[in-house]
Amino acid sequence: MGKVLVIQGAGMNMRGKAQLETFGPMTLGEMNEQIVGYAEELGMDVEMFHSNIEGEVINALYAAHDDDYEAGIINPAGYTTTTGPIKAAIAQ
C-alpha cells in the first residue's frame, strides 16, 4: 500500500496531560509512534497530522487528495460535533 494520512483531531495534544482518569496516560506522541510502528510492519508509508484548527484539517485532507494518498484515517476527537466542513472534505 502507498501513502496513508492519519489525522488526529482537536484536543488530542492534551492526551496524557489532562483527563487522565478518562483517557489514560498515553500521549499523542506515543499514540503516533505506535501507529507508525505498526504501519512500518505492514509496509505502509504513514504521515501523521494533528491540528486543533478545523481549517488546517480540511487543508490537509485536500492536500492528501492532490498528493495521491491512497487512504486516510481520521480520529475526529473534538470535531465529532462540529464537522460539517470536514465531512464535506472527506466526501470529496
Task: Please report, for each region that a protein language model flagged, where it lies by residue.
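Glycine- and acidic-residue-enriched helix-capping/strand-helix junction motifs
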Residues: 15-30
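Generic alpha-helical secondary structure signal
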Residues: 26-29, 33, 55, 84
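A short, N-terminal amphipathic alpha-helix
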Residues: 31-46
